[in-house]
């Protein structure tokens, strides 16, 4: 893929990095579905266990919730046509990823390096570098370091989940920092919506014993399940 005329659908081997189970769908589910329809290779890395969304639930303690979220992620990938594609769950603590350079961080980075070395992606889809969630920012840094150490140089697209709702002015792209890439997902938008429905712990009252739990708002879902997905790539 030429840097001057990036067509994400021309990618052959694709790496997706999701800070939590559901980010793969919210951020790039439509593109994943279109790539799968074209027979592309995909490997999805889920960084955290997603276990912090219902901290006060008695019926769903963190280990049980984390297992549920992995199951939901598998269902979502299947809805996107990627049910047979490889995926890696790093199971880092949700909202508390290890600090850069720590033993746990290096171990996680090395797993990503191994995936990247085997896959040799020509496209990597990462969270936006300044998305206003600690796991998204930390995940971007970890993925970039893994790519650098693996000496693999794919085209990179970044997706934002929370920027429009929670971002400060300095979180948005600077002038000339990135180029916008709009991907038409109208052929796969229904698959994306079905995939998001698989994440029922995040979209419904499936877990009903924690009144303080996180839940995706209808406005957020509507914003991220339209007919176009927006990505950014670093300006050349």
Residue ranges with predicted function:
Residues 24-33, 76, 182, 232-234:
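Generic detector of contiguous secondary-structure segments
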Residues 3, 10-21, 25-64:
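ATP-dependent adenylation/pyrophosphate-handling site
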Residues 1-17, 38, 60-65, 78-88, ...:
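Metal-dependent de-N-acetylase/amidase catalytic core
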């Amino acid at each position: 893929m030429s840097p001057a005329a990036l067509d994400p659908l021309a990618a052959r081997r694709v790496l997706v990095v999701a800070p939590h189970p559901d980010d793969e769908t919210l951020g790039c589910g439509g593109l994943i579905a279109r790539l799968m329809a074209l027979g592309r290779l995909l490997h999805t890395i889920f960084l955290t266990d997603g276990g912090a969304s219902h901290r006060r639930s008695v019926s769903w303690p963190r280990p049980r919730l984390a297992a549920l979220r992995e199951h939901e992620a598998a269902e979502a990938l299947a809805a996107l046509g990627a049910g047979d594609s490889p995926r890696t769950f790093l199971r880092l603590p949700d909202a508390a990823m290890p600090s850069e350079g720590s033993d746990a961080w290096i171990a996680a980075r090395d797993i990503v390096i191994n995936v990247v070395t085997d896959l040799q992606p020509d496209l990597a889809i990462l969270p936006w570098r300044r998305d206003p969630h600690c796991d998204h920012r930390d995940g971007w840094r970890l993925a970039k370091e893994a790519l650098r150490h693996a000496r693999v140089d794919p085209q990179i697209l970044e997706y934002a989940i929370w920027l429009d709702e929670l971002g400060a002015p300095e979180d948005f792209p600077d002038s000339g920092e990135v180029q916008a890439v709009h991907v038409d997902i109208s052929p796969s938008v229904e698959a994306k919506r079905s995939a998001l429905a698989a994440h029922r712990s995040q979209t419904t009252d499936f877990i009903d014993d924690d009144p303080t739990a996180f839940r995706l708002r209808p406005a957020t879902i509507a914003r991220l399940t339209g007919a176009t997905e927006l990505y950014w790539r670093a300006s050349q």
